[in-house]
Amino acid sequence: MGTWRRLLLFGGVSLRGGGAATVPPRGCRALGCGRQLLGAESEALKQRRTQIMSRGLPKQKPIEGVREVIVVASGKGGVGKSTTAVNLALALAANDSSKAVGLLDVDVYGPSIPKMMNLRGNPELSPNNLMRPLLNYGIACMSMGFLVEETAPLVWRGLMVMSAIEKLLRQVDWGQLDYLVVDMPPGTGDVQLSVSQNIPISGAVIVSTPQDIALMDAHKGAEMFRKVNVPVLGLVQNMSVFQCPKCKHKTHIFGADGARKLAQTLDLDVLGDVPLHLSIREASDMGQPVVFSQPGSDEAKAYLHIASEVVRRLKSSPE
């Protein structure tokens, strides 16, 4: 990286202000003049770096009333992350009826929780002017989808998205929750970083299909959480196998055990396998998640097992 480019990045461009980048006088080619400029640039660069480093990372602040935060993430879209988040929340409650569970949708551009949890309407405000989550199937839910029209696209820049995330994190009255499941957007961008740096997260669950292209991005997602000191609880291998409803023959449409190979590479465990099954898709589209509507099915049992593994790892993780 050249000197002038470094100065533009660290010295001249800042959301919080700062001096403009120094530009050498036109036609100035004298060696002494150049050395003076380089010396000035070097000193300005050092000062700017010191200013940036002194700010540090945002101080993490727990969400009031929430004991454990579990984020459900994926490296890419279309792997069943939101379906996993919804059914994980329901499974956590089903496995232990004494536990209060919430579900937070921070996928601002593509919120899925309202549809999957069969919820509509706007949140009411508490006396403290905080939004109250909408409730269904015993799960308290909050999503940007409750605040905008279902078909209205959000054409927002990054700062507006970050402001919305801040409101979803800090301006919701959750009451007392044992578990808050957070449905992340796909990828490893601003939202993931902002959430990870602003609230204490008990653990991350990475969702992937067994195919190589999805596993590549899942690898990146797991590494990102490790870099921001978020414990990765394990991987969920979604759409692991398809069983023909007539002949019962099993086919690994997306490949076999790809997530297990990745888990070995990352020194992680696979929390469970979820089959590719029509009932999961139909139940989600109807707003009746399979853990609620078909609790005795093999599909629901897969999510119940995953929830048990998540809780076991939370209990064994250091405080």
Curated annotation (Swiss-Prot):
It comes from the Eukaryota. InterPro entries: Mrp-like_CS, Mrp/NBP35_ATP-bd, NUBPL-like, P-loop_NTPase, YlxH/NBP35. ATP binds at G75, K76, G77, G78, V79, G80, K81, S82. Pfam families: ParA. GO terms for molecular function: 4 iron, 4 sulfur cluster binding; ATP binding; ATP-dependent FeS chaperone activity; metal ion binding. Belongs to the Mrp/NBP35 ATP-binding proteins family. Iron-sulfur cluster transfer protein involved in the assembly of the mitochondrial membrane respiratory chain NADH dehydrogenase (Complex I). May deliver one or more Fe-S clusters to complex I subunits. This is Iron-sulfur cluster transfer protein NUBPL. It comes from Mus musculus (Mouse). The lineage of its organism: Eukaryota, Metazoa, Chordata, Craniata, Vertebrata.
